[in-house]
């Protein structure tokens, strides 16, 4: 049985690992997952992203980040899902927690935050909310 929503699986693994106070979390890798992890790293939600290539598969390892014993990521929510895609224009991109969180957006220029997409003047598919 194949997995239907690999991005939701990635976000759930990160959420569960942080609740269990794990230092790292590993999962099967894909270009989309690596791009999302890189955005999370640039925004300071995770410490490190590594992709290890084995014989036939690659593994994505994310090093989680904590502040005073609490996870840096308070909330992570999948928005656009395979059964209901959520596309927004540049003027309708959502703001998460009045700008304290980020929305991860898939645009024609790649995966980026809602702020970067607004600055570039492009919309796209809203993948997830993170705060």
Curated annotation (Swiss-Prot):
One of its GO terms (cellular component) is ribosome. GO terms for biological process: translation. Keywords: Ribonucleoprotein, Ribosomal protein, RNA-binding, rRNA-binding. InterPro entries: Ribosomal_uS8, Ribosomal_uS8_CS, Ribosomal_uS8_sf. It comes from the Bacteria. GO terms for molecular function: rRNA binding; structural constituent of ribosome. Pfam families: Ribosomal_S8. Part of the 30S ribosomal subunit. Contacts proteins S5 and S12. Belongs to the universal ribosomal protein uS8 family. PANTHER family: 40S RIBOSOMAL PROTEIN S15A. One of the primary rRNA binding proteins, it binds directly to 16S rRNA central domain where it helps coordinate assembly of the platform of the 30S subunit. This is Small ribosomal subunit protein uS8. It comes from Acinetobacter baumannii (strain AB0057). The lineage of its organism: Bacteria, Pseudomonadati, Pseudomonadota, Gammaproteobacteria, Moraxellales.
């Amino acid at each position: 049985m194949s997995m239907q929503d690999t991005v939701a699986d990635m976000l759930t693994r990160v959420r569960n690992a942080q609740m269990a106070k794990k230092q790292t979390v590993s999962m099967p890798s894909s270009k989309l997952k690596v791009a999302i992890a890189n955005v999370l790293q640039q925004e300071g939600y995770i410490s490190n992203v590594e992709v290890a290539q084995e014989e036939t598969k690659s593994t994505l390892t994310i090093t989680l980040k904590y502040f005073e014993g609490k996870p840096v990521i308070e909330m992570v929510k999948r928005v656009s899902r395979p059964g209901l895609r959520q596309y927004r224009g540049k003027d309708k991109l959502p703001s998460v927690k009045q700008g304290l969180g980020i929305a991860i957006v898939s645009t024609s220029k790649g995966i980026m935050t809602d702020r970067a997409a607004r600055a570039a003047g492009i919309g796209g598919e809203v993948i997830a909310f993170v705060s």
